[in-house]
Amino acid sequence: AAAGELAGELSDVSLGNQLMAQWCAKVAGLDDLLPPDHVQSALGTVAALNMAATAYGLVNGVTPTGDRFDAGHPGENDHAKHVFVGENLCAAMTFLYHGQSATGLEIAERIYTALALKTCAPWNQRCLIHADTGLPIWGDDYYSNLAIWALPMAAANQDIASFTAAGGMIDRMIEAAN
């Protein structure tokens, strides 16, 4: 079904970053917003569907049969069936925060491999990369990708307060640079 046909209806499309609010809560040091079993179920679905649909992170929208969701946009700039870099990084960190480090790190590595090694452009801030090729589709100056700097914080299972506190990783990095 095209996106317009879904208005007012439920969709069974699995969104790659359906737990964005969970990531925000973890970064802010807040309690989980959803029951742990719901979070684990959603992460399992994202790994089984969205991660399996590409070698370059997570496809943004995947049907229960594993097909990339076609939102009906012409050309390649259909965000639903490709990889949204910033959103994928947040999803990777959500896996990290919820005890699935191997999966979270693999998602982040897939994205970084596409950006830094495949396209040799690690500092370009791409928005959307192609799910089949890992090559850029859209966005050369997209700042949500700066979320990558929060990856060490998520890998350490820390919130922003503890990560930036005296003696924390940021403090240690600054001290080492001095």
What are these regions (language model features)?
Residues A2-A176:
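Active-site core of glycosidic bond-cleaving carbohydrate-active enzymes
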